[in-house]
């Protein structure tokens, strides 16, 4: 009688998403005990090791550079104890961690609104970047920006309720694959009023005025 070929029943990643150039642990579960197995993530080979349960194999791999939202896992050349080889499986993939950047901008003076912009990778058009501005008294202003087709975003934040001084802006978000970008932040100096500049001629004029003495 022909024996059933082994099959891959599950594949998991730890962490569930990872950045390019960082290591991820992969756990493969099969329906039968195996004597051999191999796998690749985005073309990079995993060094698989059989666990105490020969149905479970694990390995680490560095996430390769890719422009895609995910990187594909290919499991192949896996043999059961009778030498039967299972079919190549490419049904699993891991999201690559998206990224957010905040652009550079100047200190804000004499204005209560600041325009903040930035870029993203692995966010699709219409997805949302969450922002918050925090002053030195921990007062918070929240905002959100919509990612455009080219991956950029822009938002105007109203700072009128915040205290003058150093403001820290934070940006974060998750894409459609529930992969969360690392939060980024930047700081700037905020002054809601414009400094009054006294003309030099007024200084000369006032100095020439006779001082009034109390009677």
Where are the regions a protein language model picked out?
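Non-catalytic beta-sheet/beta-sandwich ligand-binding modules that flank or precede catalytic cores
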Residues: 1-115, 124-127, 135-183, 193-202, ...
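Short, flexible micro-motifs
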Residues: 121
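Beta-strand-rich recognition domains
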Residues: 187-190
